[in-house]
């Protein structure tokens, strides 16, 4: 069965949870496909989600670190987007930072339905230590990564492409496991490419086979 392109504009808020234990209380098991958005607290995750879904689905704030919870958005009954707590912001109290890091680690290590991770980084300051830790963890776990260089409108086209190429070179040892794209929530730079990658991640082979089986079963039932 050939499935049409995923419509990310249909995303709707599902739940917020302080940690993986509470997340499991609300979700119908560790099933389906989830795509996680992770990044430093000032990387622009909420703005990116709002642009990609064409709605104000995630709260934005001028105060980095506002997203303290795991926020889950439903695309359809099989697919979800997950906005993870921001990490690494210096002004966040240490105790709160440790709590966020624990929730982040629990989700990444225990969530079996994770199909891809978008790691957002300011294009002017990419590949900080925590960004690299996130990328390395995902690759080691056979989870594809999109390194998204945000705020690309802050650089001219030449400088932007130079930075993209530099980051691609630094991540080249990961081969095809990591893709790198420039992105701007303000100007819409890279939106089409990102949606294309997310669409692929939303359609793993096992889910396509399941949807085909469900379609055939529904046709049989309707013919009775």
Curated annotation (Swiss-Prot):
Pfam families: MMR_HSR1. Keywords: Cell cycle, Cell division, GTP-binding, Magnesium, Metal-binding, Nucleotide-binding, Septation. GTP binds at residues 39-46, 65-69, 83-86, 150-153, 183-185. One of its GO terms (molecular function) is metal ion binding. Residues 31-204 form the EngB-type G domain. Its cofactor is Mg(2+). Mg(2+) binds at residues 46, 67. One of its GO terms (cellular component) is cytosol. Disulfide bonds: none annotated. One of its GO terms (biological process) is division septum assembly. The keyword RNA-binding does not apply. Belongs to the TRAFAC class TrmE-Era-EngA-EngB-Septin-like GTPase superfamily. EngB GTPase family. Necessary for normal cell division and for the maintenance of normal septation. This is Probable GTP-binding protein EngB. The lineage of its organism: Bacteria, Pseudomonadati, Pseudomonadota, Gammaproteobacteria, Alteromonadales. The gene is engB.
